Regions:
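Short proline/glycine- and acidic-rich turn/helix-capping motifs at secondary-structure junctions
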Residues: 48-52, 104-120
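General N-terminal targeting signals
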Residues: 33-35, 91-95, 113
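Aliphatic-rich, non-membrane protein domains
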Residues: 3, 21, 27-28, 98-109
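Surface-exposed, low-hydrophobicity interaction/linker segments
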Residues: 17-63
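Generic alpha-helix signal with a bias toward terminal, lower-confidence helices
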Residues: 28-30, 58, 77-79, 108, ...
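N-terminal, charge-rich interaction modules
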Residues: 1-26
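Amphipathic protein-protein interaction modules
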Residues: 46-104
Length: 120
């Protein structure tokens, strides 16, 4: 897993966090903001982007999932810990990592759907 994304398994939840203050993530956020001026990429807008992306591409990963981001961090949670939610969390994180690593795909997604995303 890339250094900017973390999965933390607790007794009562599994969290997935994206450190948006890492240089790579900040640079991607600046480019996304150039593409769509509403996409100033704080934690809330990463949440909006990921929510829309997963609705379109893997809605099953949003079942039993909740996000609670802050300005400087994206955070999502599965509040039940089971083999199924552990698997979902790892798939979720891998999809985020794939988007970050394929920047052009991410930029094109925002070009194509940026007006439909409910930015903060």
């Amino acid at each position: 897993m890339a250094e900017y994304i973390h999965i933390d398994e607790q007794e009562n939840c599994i969290s997935i966090t994206l450190d948006i203050e890492q240089d790579k993530i900040m640079a991607i956020g600046e480019k996304l903001n150039e593409i769509n001026e509403e996409a100033y990429m704080n934690g809330y807008n990463w949440e909006a982007l990921f929510h829309y992306y997963f609705e379109q591409n893997a809605p099953e990963l949003l079942e039993d999932f909740d996000a609670d981001s802050e300005a400087g961090m994206y955070a999502g949670y599965y509040y039940e810990v089971s083999d199924e939610t552990k698997e979902k969390a790892h798939k979720f994180a891998k999809m985020i990592e794939a988007l970050i690593e394929d920047e052009e795909k991410l930029y094109q997604f925002v070009r194509d759907y940026g007006e439909e995303i409910e930015w903060d």
